[in-house]
Curated annotation (Swiss-Prot):
Keywords: Cell wall biogenesis/degradation, Cytoplasm, Phosphopantetheine, Phosphoprotein. GO terms for biological process: cell wall organization; lipoteichoic acid biosynthetic process. It comes from Streptococcus suis (strain 05ZYH33). Residues 1-77 form the Carrier domain. The modification O-(pantetheine 4'-phosphoryl)serine is found at S35. 4'-phosphopantetheine is transferred from CoA to a specific serine of apo-DCP. This is D-alanyl carrier protein. One of its GO terms (cellular component) is cytoplasm.
Length: 79
């Protein structure tokens, strides 16, 4: 399973939403993510990918779409 597929599955598991057709849609505006959901997502991403998401790098505008989340995780995996 690749990073993209894993992240889409995590989002679906946590929020009961299939976002595969809305990769560039703002997940906050769409009602998929909120502040508590963001914390849950970060914890799960850190656990599954063995990464640390620094609070200083987690801005809503930087992680508000599925594509941005995927890019952020890939970047942290190669840091």
């Amino acid at each position: 399973m690749d990073v993209k597929e894993t992240i889409l599955n995590i989002i679906e598991e946590l929020f009961m939403e299939d976002v595969s057709e809305m990769m560039d849609e703002d997940l906050f505006d769409a009602g998929v993510l909120d502040s508590m959901g963001t914390v849950e997502l970060i914890v799960e991403l850190e656990s599954r990918f063995n990464i640390t998401v620094p609070v200083s790098e987690f801005g809503r505008e930087d992680w508000n779409t599925a594509n941005k989340i995927i890019s952020g995780v890939v970047e942290l995996m190669h840091a």
